[in-house]
């Protein structure tokens, strides 16, 4: 999330939008009238890179969790186009040990050269991300940074998920000609195997992965003022939830999508769930940071049975508080903060969490969640 927020803010110097109202946003959740059929299974074509010509950021992110060894992280490629004139690509990698081996924690962000999108695949010098022809596995290989040499294979364990018809929320007063968009699609539970090399260290990775592809077709601080995100993995279940809240320009509209799975099937896909920030405390940035969090899930199964669940945990371990504007020139930062009230921070947490589902499931696992604050 860091790079696309940075690029958007830098390009527009923080200008604020007028108040268009609720009628100028068209959430994908508004199109879903039958909650037992709120998603469809993804196809190879769904994962094709869109590459719009206007301002946008497209990402593919693979969140991996190795429950036995304690290693967790993500590999991400970011393809961005600023105002239709400047296209860049970046490979970011986060590696973290939630069992306390702080010396193994690392973060790399590397600019890509000679990059190209080919259907659902992505290539650059020293990097390949490929979806197999059977739509069952992704392979990520990267040697673009010696501190994070990655060779991972993800195999789908449950069907891929896209909400509604195309997973896209549109912005604009004319739905046929929107001026912005937000799109997400998922592989909520996959196996992962491979290695991560950092210097002379080699880490064997074997566990579970959640894969998400996203497209944000507008300036980031115009699209959302806050985000909540969860990737929870246990030995038998996965839980994924993505929520964003628009600025006042789009009536503080909240869009929430969520997925619960067992090890081999989708239990429920749901919309309009509630994320509860518990015991928030205002830190030195001025944002109310939660000390615990609950992600609620309230939906229907494919056979129309009610499925209610939650993932809860204390937010003891903060992996990083990311100051999105840290690398932006001070004069742009001053304008952005003063004009639009933008002061974006991403709080990345990794903690033991517990999943409960109303059929009697109660299981501990590992949760990686983000709480992002962009503007008031």
From Swiss-Prot:
Its main location: Golgi. GO terms for biological process: ER to Golgi ceramide transport; response to oxidative stress. SUPFAM superfamilies: AttH-like (SSF159245). It is a peripheral membrane protein. GO terms for molecular function: ceramide binding. Keywords: Cytoplasm, Endoplasmic reticulum, Golgi apparatus, Lipid transport, Membrane, Nucleus, Transport. InterPro entries: Ceramide-binding_SVF1 (IPR051385), Svf1-like_C (IPR033394), Svf1-like_N (IPR013931). It is found in: Golgi apparatus, cis-Golgi network membrane; Endoplasmic reticulum membrane; Cytoplasm; Nucleus. Residues 1-18 are annotated as: Peripherally associates with membranes. GO terms for cellular component: cis-Golgi network membrane; cytoplasm; endoplasmic reticulum membrane; nucleus. Ceramide-binding protein that may transfer ceramides from the endoplasmic reticulum membrane to the cis-Golgi network membrane, and is thereby required for the biosynthesis of complex sphingolipids. Belongs to the SVF1 family. PANTHER family: CERAMIDE-BINDING PROTEIN SVF1-RELATED (PTHR47107:SF1), SVF1-LIKE PROTEIN YDR222W-RELATED (PTHR47107). This is Ceramide-binding protein SVF1. It comes from Debaryomyces hansenii (strain ATCC 36239 / CBS 767 / BCRC 21394 / JCM 1990 / NBRC 0083 / IGC 2968). The lineage of its organism: Eukaryota, Fungi, Dikarya, Ascomycota, Saccharomycotina.
């Amino acid at each position: 999330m860091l790079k696309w927020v940075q690029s958007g803010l830098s390009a527009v110097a923080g200008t604020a939008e007028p108040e268009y109202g609720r009628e100028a946003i068209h959430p994908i959740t508004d199109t879903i009238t039958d909650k037992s059929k709120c998603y469809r299974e993804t196809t190879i074509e769904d994962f094709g890179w869109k590459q719009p010509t206007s301002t946008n950021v497209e990402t593919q992110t693979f969140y991996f969790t190795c429950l036995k060894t304690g290693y967790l992280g993500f590999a991400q490629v970011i393809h961005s186009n600023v105002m239709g004139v400047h296209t860049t690509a970046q490979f970011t990698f986060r590696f973290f040990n939630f069992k306390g081996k702080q010396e193994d924690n690392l973060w790399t962000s590397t600019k890509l050269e000679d990059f190209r999108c080919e259907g659902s695949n992505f290539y650059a010098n020293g990097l390949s991300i490929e979806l197999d022809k059977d739509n069952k596995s992704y392979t990520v290989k990267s040697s673009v940074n010696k501190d994070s040499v990655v060779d991972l294979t993800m195999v789908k364990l449950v069907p891929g998920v896209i909400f509604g018809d195309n997973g896209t929320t549109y912005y604009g007063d004319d739905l046929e000609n929107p001026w912005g968009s937000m799109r997400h699609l998922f592989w909520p539970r996959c196996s992962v195997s491979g290695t991560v090399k950092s210097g002379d260290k080699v880490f064997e990775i074997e566990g579970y992965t959640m894969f998400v592809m996203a497209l944000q077709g507008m300036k980031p601080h115009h699209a959302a003022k806050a985000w909540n995100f969860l990737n929870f993995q246990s030995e038998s279940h996965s839980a994924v939830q993505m929520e964003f809240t628009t600025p006042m320009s789009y009536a503080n509209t909240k869009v929430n999508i969520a997925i619960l799975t067992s090890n081999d099937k989708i239990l429920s896909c749901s919309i309009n769930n509630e994320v509860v920030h518990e015991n928030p405390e205002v830190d030195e940035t001025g944002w109310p940071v939660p000390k615990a969090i609950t992600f609620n899930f309230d939906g229907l199964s494919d056979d129309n049975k009610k499925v209610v669940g939650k993932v809860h945990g204390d937010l003891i371990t903060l992996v990083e508080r990311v100051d999105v504007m840290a690398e932006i020139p001070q004069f742009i930062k001053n304008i952005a903060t003063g004009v639009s009230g933008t002061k974006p921070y991403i709080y990345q947490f990794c903690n033991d969490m517990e999943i409960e589902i109303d059929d009697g499931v109660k299981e501990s696992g590992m949760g990686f969640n983000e709480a992002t604050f962009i503007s008031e």
